[in-house]
């Protein structure tokens, strides 16, 4: 492909509101164009990357025994109402009506539709196991789209669905898909952690995420370098501390004027934050719930969501605190006798002794309080150096970008949708399902996040839009241009993917653009061409080697073969 004819336009200007490196470089390099918030077009060069990613994913899915199909984008509401997700999925679900006033949604995921297809066709155990997948566009009305392709409202995804006769067979299908996912990420040269995850809106029995470490990811993960444990922080169980109760001290009522935060209280009373009970009042479906936690800990509202079984809860407003407890925020305490307020106590307060606690009296706290709590749950945010639940070693905590997600669904969809089969004894049973997603367009961003420097992208060879870039330094120089033409034809005839920069622009522009778009190998045809030499530059190592013109073809073929063409 000749750059002068290629639909590729880079820009020198720094794009606005591009925090993530992938968003910045993909925009500057002309790979993506924003249409609206969270909605992007892929230009031809990005489309080449996309297709290479798809082909790797497709190859591993096919090897795993999955069969490709294509489902619809427009889903009738009736299917989603069968599983209860029409309402449960929330505002992220794009809903619309047709001219006959029938309800539809733009599919964010396809458990309902694939289950409907299978229940219409699968009747016998002889038709199972079955694994079906598609690569298709999805839609989610993200509240806050950001970081370019990392978090959009329209995106391309591979979703697969397995159907089995029983739990054992379903687990086997799940393990096969997990292996396929590991192969995919290895072939993409992505550094990935497989972590235990919450089942979320998809539902089911268990799940895992495949996460790339980056500060622009929405997932917060905890991992142990000692035993290999890794999980989303929201499902890491922080156990009760191994502490003994202290001998009780005399309870004191202390004046704490306008002291409303844990930090202020700790400083004012000269006590550790771990010796303070923090009381937080939530409202869930008009019902007040008080959550107690140690002062040095934070509440993980994702854990609360799992505990409550809904995300429909919020912090109490000032007027609600006044009405329910006759106090103000900062002085809320767990003394609610005669009030219809549920109390939830975090594990961190197990055997807590001689604590500082508010008691619903403005500007006062108790010191040396000893409260006998009976029931404890884990609702604390995981923090760096918290003990690993498997081996007790200190945990590491990092942000991560979810690239793949696998779910062992069980009968979450087959039961309500009556997707039944008849077993060998003639007994009708629900199929046991799994589902498996990979964010295809998000992978483009993830690759750039892991492969870039200050100048631009450094594509791994398996997904690079082109394998080789030929930069003709001076297109007006007959020797340089004819040499570039010769190399372009020689390489393309060998099936090597080449972008020939034949533009009539300055060498500086060509070199800057070459670094920006990140093609793995660059052949620089400059002044040395008259001496029979060109320069071959490795974009990853920046190593430059002079190669005789008549040896370039063999040299390129050798490095492509060595590096996994």
Swiss-Prot record:
One of its GO terms (molecular function) is aminoacyl-tRNA deacylase activity. One of its GO terms (cellular component) is cytosol. It is found in: Cytoplasm. This is Proline--tRNA ligase. The keyword Cytoplasm applies. One of its GO terms (biological process) is prolyl-tRNA aminoacylation. Homodimer. Catalyzes the attachment of proline to tRNA(Pro) in a two-step reaction: proline is first activated by ATP to form Pro-AMP and then transferred to the acceptor end of tRNA(Pro). As ProRS can inadvertently accommodate and process non-cognate amino acids such as alanine and cysteine, to avoid such errors it has two additional distinct editing activities against alanine. One activity is designated as 'pretransfer' editing and involves the tRNA(Pro)-independent hydrolysis of activated Ala-AMP. InterPro entries: aa-tRNA-synt_IIb, aa-tRNA-synth_II, aa-tRNA-synth_II/BPL/LPL, Anticodon-bd, Anticodon-bd_dom_sf, Pro-tRNA-ligase_IIa, Pro-tRNA-synth_IIa_bac-type, Pro-tRNA-Synthase_IIa_type1. It catalyses: tRNA(Pro) + L-proline + ATP = L-prolyl-tRNA(Pro) + AMP + diphosphate. Keywords: Aminoacyl-tRNA synthetase, ATP-binding, Cytoplasm, Ligase, Nucleotide-binding, Protein biosynthesis. Pfam families: HGTP_anticodon (PF03129), tRNA-synt_2b (PF00587), tRNA_edit (PF04073). SUPFAM superfamilies: Class II aaRS ABD-related (SSF52954), Class II aaRS and biotin synthetases (SSF55681), YbaK/ProRS associated domain (SSF55826). Consists of three domains: the N-terminal catalytic domain, the editing domain and the C-terminal anticodon-binding domain. CDD domains: ProRS-INS, ProRS_anticodon_short, ProRS_core_prok. Belongs to the class-II aminoacyl-tRNA synthetase family. ProS type 1 subfamily. Its EC number is 6.1.1.15. Its main location: cytoplasm.
């Amino acid at each position: 492909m000749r750059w002068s004819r290629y639909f590729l336009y880079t820009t020198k200007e720094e794009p606005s509101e591009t925090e993530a490196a992938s968003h910045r470089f993909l925009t500057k390099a002309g790979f993506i164009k924003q249409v609206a918030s969270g909605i992007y077009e892929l230009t031809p060069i990005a489309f080449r990357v996309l297709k290479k990613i798809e082909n790797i994913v497709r190859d591993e899915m096919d090897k795993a025994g999955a069969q490709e199909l294509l489902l619809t984008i427009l889903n009738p509401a009736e299917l989603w109402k069968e599983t209860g997700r029409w309402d449960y999925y929330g505002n992220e679900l794009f809903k619309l009506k047709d001219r006959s006033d029938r309800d539809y949604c733009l599919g964010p995921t396809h458990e309902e539709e694939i289950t409907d297809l299978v229940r219409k066709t699968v009747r016998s155990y002889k038709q199972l196991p079955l694994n079906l997948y598609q690569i298709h566009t999805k839609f989610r009305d993200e509240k806050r789209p950001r970081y370019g392709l990392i978090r959009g409202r329209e995106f391309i995804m591979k979703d697969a669905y397995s159907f089995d006769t029983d739990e054992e067979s379903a687990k086997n299908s799940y393990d096969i898909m997990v292996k396929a996912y590991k192969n995919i990420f290895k072939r993409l040269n992505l550094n990935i952690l497989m972590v235990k995850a919450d089942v979320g809106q998809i539902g089911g029995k268990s799940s895992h995420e495949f996460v790339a470490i980056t500060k622009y990811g929405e997932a917060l993960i905890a991992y142990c370098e000692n035993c290999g444990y890794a999980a989303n922080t929201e499902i890491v169980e922080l156990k009760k501390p191994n502490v003994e109760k202290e001998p009780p001290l005399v309870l004191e009522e202390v004046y704490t004027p306008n002291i409303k935060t844990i930090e202020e209280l700790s400083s004012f009373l000269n006590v550790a934050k771990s010796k303070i009970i923090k009381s937080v009042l939530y409202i869930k479906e008009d019902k007040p719930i008080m959550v107690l936690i140690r002062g040095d800990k934070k509440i993980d509202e994702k854990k609360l969501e799992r505990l409550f079984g809904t995300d429909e809860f919020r912090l109490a407003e000032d007027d609600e605190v006044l009405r329910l407890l006759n106090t103000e925020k900062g002085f809320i305490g767990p003394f609610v006798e005669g009030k219809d307020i549920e109390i939830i106590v975090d594990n961190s307060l197990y055997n807590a002794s001689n604590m500082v606690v508010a008691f619903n009296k403005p500007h006062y706290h108790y010191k040396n309080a000893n409260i006998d709590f009976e029931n404890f749950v884990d609702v604390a945010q995981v923090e760096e150096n918290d003990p690993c639940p498997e081996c007790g070693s200190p945990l590491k905590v990092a942000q991560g970008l979810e690239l793949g997600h696998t779910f062992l669904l069980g009968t979450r969809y087959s039961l309500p949708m009556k997707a039944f089969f008849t077993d060998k004894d003639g007994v009708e049973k629900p199929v046991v399902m799994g589902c498996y997603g990979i964010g295809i367009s998000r992978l483009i961003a993830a690759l750039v996040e892991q492969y870039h420097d200050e100048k631009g992208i450094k594509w791994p060879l398996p997904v690079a839009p082109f394998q080789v870039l030929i930069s003709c330094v001076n297109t007006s120089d007959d020797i340089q241009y004819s040499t570039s033409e010769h190399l372009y034809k020689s390489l393309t005839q060998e099936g090597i993917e080449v972008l020939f920069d034949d533009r009539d622009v300055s060498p500086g522009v060509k070199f800057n653009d070459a670094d920006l778009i990140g093609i793995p190998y660059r052949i620089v045809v400059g002044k040395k061409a008259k001496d029979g030499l060109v320069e071959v530059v490795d974009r990853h190592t920046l190593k430059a080697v002079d190669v005789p013109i008549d040896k370039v073809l063999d040299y390129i073929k050798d490095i492509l073969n060595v590096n996994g063409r």
